[in-house]
C-alpha cells in the first residue's frame, strides 16, 4: 500500500477506489456521531448544558487541525529530504483543508465558550491564541506558495515554512498544561489513557474517525486534481517544444 | 570551521544596519513614536496605561523587528551580495545567524535597553523589576529577530514581501510572546516562564539559521 | 602542457526549465587548466543561467556538474553594498577569504585609487565593475566564471582586464565567460546556447 | 492638465501593491497580527481591552501604513522608474498623489474596512457606531498614507530608510491620531472632532503631494 | 538641410561638484536636428552625470541648458518594475504619453515576442535593455539621450539599434549617447569629458 503513495500512477489508481470509500465511511461515522451527540447522550450541565453537544464537532475538528498540520510538516519533510513529488502534492492539498478544519475548531470553540465562559474569545489564553496562529500558519503557507513563480520554488519555500512552523503543534497540545487557561486539560488523549465517560467517549471517537476519513478522502481528491494539472502542464510544455 | 567569513558577514551586516541614517537612534524613534501614539489613542488613565505598558513594549519589539528585517536579505538578493555569501564555503546557516545577530545588536538590543524608560513613560513604578524586564525583552527580541529572519529570507525574492513576512513571522513569534508576557505579569504558573522564554529563544537560535540558509539558497536560485 | 591533468570543471547533460519552457538542454563542457571557454548566444538564450548553474547557485533540472576547483563568480550584479567603498569592500572579502593581498596595490592596478573611498551608491557603472574584478586578484582561484565581463568598461579597462585574464590563463587558470563581442584573450572553445 | 500620465501612475502603483503576493490580504494579516499580539501582552480584562481597542487600531493603521510605504519611492529610485516619472511632463505632485492613493486603496482602505471586526475582537459592543468609526479610520488612514509618503520620499535615497521614515512620519501622524481618537471616544470637546479629523486629512492631501514631489526631485538628483 | 534650424538642445558652461571635487566644468554643446554627439571619457569621468543633467534630472552647479524639444532618456537603469512584463510596461507608457503605436509591432521589431509576457524580474539583461529601447519607438520625440546604449545587447540587437538610431537621425531627430565602443551610426561630433 505504501508504494502507492510514492508513485503517482499507482496513487491515482488507489485513490480512485479509496477516496469514495473514505467519503462514505467518513460521512457515516460523522452522522452516527452527531446523532448520538445531539439526541442520545445526556447533556452535561457542568459543561454548559445542551451547548456541550457542539463537542462532537469541536473536538474532532481540534484533533484534525493538529493532525493536519503535523501531516503538512511531515509531507514537507519527506519532500525536502527525498524530493518525492507526491509528498509536495500532498502538502499542497492539505493546507487549505487544514485551514478549514482549524477555522471550524475556532468557530465551534467560540460558540461553546460564549455560554460557558461568558466570552467568545479570551485574548491571553494560550490555547486559543495558538490555534488562531495555526490558522495563520496555514494561510501564510498558502500565500507564500502563491507568491513564488515556479512550482519547484513554491514547494521549497512552503516546505521550509511548514517545518519551522511545526513548533506550534506541541504548544497547542500542551498549552493547557503549561498555562492557566479557561480551557479544560486533555481528557481523551493523555498519557494515562482516556478519562472521559464512555457515553461521551465512544461517539466522540467515532466522530473523530469520521472526520479523519472525510479529511483523508478530500486530501486524496485534491491530490488527484493536482497530479492531473501537473501532467497537463508537462504535456503542454512538451508539445510546445515540438 | 573557519570563522573568518562569519565574522566578516557580521561586520558587513552591522555596517549596513548603521548605514541607513542614524543607526540605533532610528529604532528608538520608532519605539518612542509607538509609545507616544498609543496613549494618545488610549487616553492617559494611569491604571490603564500601567496595565498596557508591557504589552505595548512587546508588540513594538515584534513589529520593529519586522520592519528592520524586511530589507536584510532582500537587499542581498538585489545587489548580488547573496551570491557571494553562498559561495564563501562557510556554512550558510552560520553566515545567516551572524547577519541576524548583527541586526539584532544594532536595532533590537537598543530597543530592549530603552524599555525601562518606556515603562516609566507608561507610569510604571521605578524598581529593580524594570532591569529584570530588560533582560526578558532582550531575550525575547532575539527570538523575534531569528524568526523574523526566516520570514525575511523566505520572502526575499518577492518584492514588497514585507507584509508576507509579517504573516509568516507572527505565528512564529507566538511562543515567545506568550512566555515573555507570562514571565512579566507573574501570574499563576509563571514560575517557569523565564526559563521557558529562554528555552524558546534558544530553540529559535538553533533552528532558525538552518531554515534561513535553505530559504536563501532558494532565493538565489 | 600535454600532460593529462584533471579538469577544473566538467558538466554534462545540463538542462533547465524557465516558466514551463525548456531554456536549454544537453549542455556539457570540460575545462582544463589554461583553457578559456566563451559562451555565446542571443539575448535571453540562457548564458547567465548556465553560468549561475556552474557556480552552484542555480539547481539544474537535469545533468551533472563536477567542480573540484575553487572559483570566482562575477555576475551582472556586482555585490557591492550602497555604503561600501571599494576599499572597504575589498577589505571585507580579503578578510572573509583569509587573503593577505595588498588592497592598495589591487586598487591601483584597477585604476580605482580615485574612487577608492566613494560609497558604492555613488560609483559610476565602470567603477562598480572594476571593484568586482578587483575581487579576482584578492585570492588566486583556478576557475573564473565571468558574465559579460566587458560591460561598462572603458577602453583602458578592457585592456587591463584582458591582461589580467591572459595572465590567469598562462598560470594554469581557466575561465568561462559569456560575451557578445570579440574576446581580447586566447579562446580555447566557444559554446553557443 | 493631461490626466493620462496620472492615471497611468495610479495603475502602475496599484499593480505593484498587489504584486507582492496576495495583495490586500497581507496588510490585513499584519493588522490582525498586531491586534492579536497586543492583548497577549496586555491580558484579557474586558474593560481594559475595550478601552485600548480603538487606540490599538489607530496605532496598527499608522504602523502598517509605514511598512507599506517604506518601499514605494525607494524602489522607484532603485529601478529607474522615478527618472521616467519625473520626465512625463505631468506635475510630479499629481503623480505622487496618484501613487499614494493607489497604495492606500490596496493596503489602507482594506484595513479600515476590517476595523469593525477588530473592534468586536476587542470586546466592543456591536453597534452602528462601528460603521461610523470605519469612516473615521478610513479618513485617518488616508492622512497617514500621505504623510507617510512624504517620509518615504525624503528617505528614498537612503537604503534601509524605513526607520528614518518612521521618525519623519510619526510626528506628522500625531494631529490625525489625536482628532481621530477624540472623535471616537466622544469625550468633552469631541463634537467638532470628526470635522477636525476631516480637515487634517484634507490638509494632508493638499500639502503632502507638493512635499513629496520636491523630495522626489531631490532623490533623483 | 543647410537651412539654419533652431537647435534641439544647447548647453553652455556646465559644471558639477561630486564629493567636494569638480567632476567637470565648462562643458557646452549644441545639437541640431539630424546630429549625433557621442560622449567619451574614462570610467567615472562624468558621462552619466552630464546626460542626467541634460535630461533635467540633475541640477548643474553652474551653466545653462536650453532644451526646447521633447526627449527620451535611457539610463543604466531601465525603469522596469519587477512585476511588469515588457508588454505591460509598454502599454503603461503608451497610455501615459498618449501614444497609439502598435505595441505588438514594437515588441516584434525588438525581437521581444518570446519574452513579451515574462515579468521584469526574470528578464535577461539584454531583454531588459530591449524593453527600454522599445520606449523610443512608442512616441516620436526629436531628442534621444542614451547612456551606453550597446550594453548587454547581442550582435543582432546592436544592428537593430543602429538601424533605429540611423532612421531617427535621417528623419530629423538627434541623439547624444555615451559610449566606450565605436558607434554604428553616423556621428557628428565627439565630446570627451
Ligand atoms: C476558541 C476557543 C477554543 C479553542 C481554540 C479550542 C481548542 C481545542 C483544542 C486544540 C483541543 C484539542 C486538545 C487535545 O487534544 O489535547 C480541544 C479539545 C477540547 N475542547 Fe476546546 N477549544 C476552544 C473552546 C472550548 C470550549 C469553550 C470548551 C468547553 C467548555 C471546549 C472543550 C473542549 C473539550 C472537552 C476538548 C476535548 C479535550 C480532551 O478531552 O482531550 N473547548 N479544544
Ligand atoms: N519565470 C520565467 N518565465 C518565463 N521565462 C523566464 C522565466 N525566468 C526566466 N525566463 C527566461 O529565461 C531566460 C533567462 O536567460 P538568461 O538571463 O540566462 O539569458 P542570457 O543568455 O544571459 O541573456 P543576456 O544576453 O540578455 O544576458 C530569459 O529568456 C528569460 O526570459
Ligand atoms: N558623493 C560622491 N563623492 C565622491 N565622488 C562621487 C560622489 N558621487 C559621485 N562621485 C563620482 O562622480 C563620478 C560619477 O561619474 P558618472 O557616473 O557620471 O561616470 P561615467 O562617466 O558615466 O562613468 P562610467 O563610464 O563608468 O559609466 C564618479 O567618478 C564617482 O566616483
Ligand atoms: Mg545574461
Ligand atoms: Mg555611466
Swiss-Prot record, chains C, E:
Any one GO BP annotation for this protein: cytochrome complex assembly
Swiss-Prot/TrEMBL keywords: ATP-binding, Cell inner membrane, Cell membrane, Cytochrome c-type biogenesis, Membrane, Nucleotide-binding, Translocase, Transport
One Pfam family of this chain: ABC_tran
EC nos: 7.6.2.5
Subcellular location: Cell inner membrane
Keyword Cell inner membrane applies: yes
Residue ranges constituting the ABC transporter domain according to the UniProt record: 9-191
Primary location recorded for the protein, binned into one broad class: membrane
GO molecular function: ABC-type heme transporter activity; ATP binding; ATP hydrolysis activity
Positions of ATP binding: 41-48
UniProt keyword ATP-binding present: yes
Recorded catalytic activity of this chain's protein: heme b(in) + ATP + H2O = heme b(out) + ADP + phosphate + H(+)
Family (UniProt): Belongs to the ABC transporter superfamily. CcmA exporter (TC 3.A.1.107) family.
Protein name: Cytochrome c biogenesis ATP-binding export protein CcmA
Native species: Hyphomonas neptunium (strain ATCC 15444)
